[in-house]
A protein has these predicted regions:
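Short helix-terminating capping/connector loops at secondary-structure junctions
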Residues: 160-164
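Acidic (Asp/Glu-rich) sequence patches and key acidic residues
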Residues: 1-147, 151-159, 174-176
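Glycine-rich, aromatic-bearing surface loops/beta-hairpins
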Residues: 167-170
Length: 176
């Protein structure tokens, strides 16, 4: 038994149940980190030599390097394609990397995840004031954020229903 604590909080958009969100893999593939980028962004418990053959990996596995914990990554390495059916969850966790790249925001100024109830979400997670000035962050308003997130979600999911989703307070919980 444990307690749930708010780990991160910010304004963003809920996409719905993570297992019911379908992603446009062609769009995601265009923004997938190169091997060199993955080496910079990877989780600390993943060794550099474990990225051998990165260029030939399936799309979801490339995103596992930076979005999943080492245990999940090693499970995939030891049992090839065992995580293929979890691609929606993996892509939900990768949304903020793609969004930041598309709109010029600094790395880790947004956060995307799915919570214990399976709700996928992406939200602004920047601490104010940011350490370095960034024009995109400086010009952000709630209206602009909502417009950008809606445009992005329509493109990354290829589903126009996200064009009308409202901004909400999103919270990522941890269980301790």
């Amino acid at each position: 038994m444990g307690w749930y604590h708010v780990n991160r909080i910010g304004k963003g958009i809920f996409l719905g149940n993570v297992d019911e969100v379908h992603y446009n893999e062609d769009f995601i593939a265009k923004h997938t980190p190169t091997k060199d980028e993955a080496l910079e962004l990877k989780q600390r418990d993943i060794r550099d030599d474990e990225l051998e053959g990165y260029e030939t990996w399936p799309l979801y596995k490339k995103w596992m390097v930076i979005t999943q914990d080492a245990w999940s990554f090693h499970r995939e390495v030891n049992d090839a394609r065992c995580c293929a059916d979890e691609s929606s969850q993996i892509y939900s966790d990768a949304l903020h990397y793609i969004f930041e790249k598309c709109y010029g925001y600094p790395l880790n100024s947004f956060f995307s995840t799915h919570d214990y109830d399976g709700n996928a979400m992406i939200f602004c997670d920047v601490l104010w004031p940011p350490k370095k000035h960034n024009e995109a962050l400086a010009a952000m308003t709630e209206e602009k954020l909502q417009t950008q997130l809606r445009e992005f979600l329509v493109e990354v999911t290829d589903d126009s229903k996200y064009a009308s989703f409202p901004l909400r307070v999103c919270e990522d919980y941890i269980k301790e």
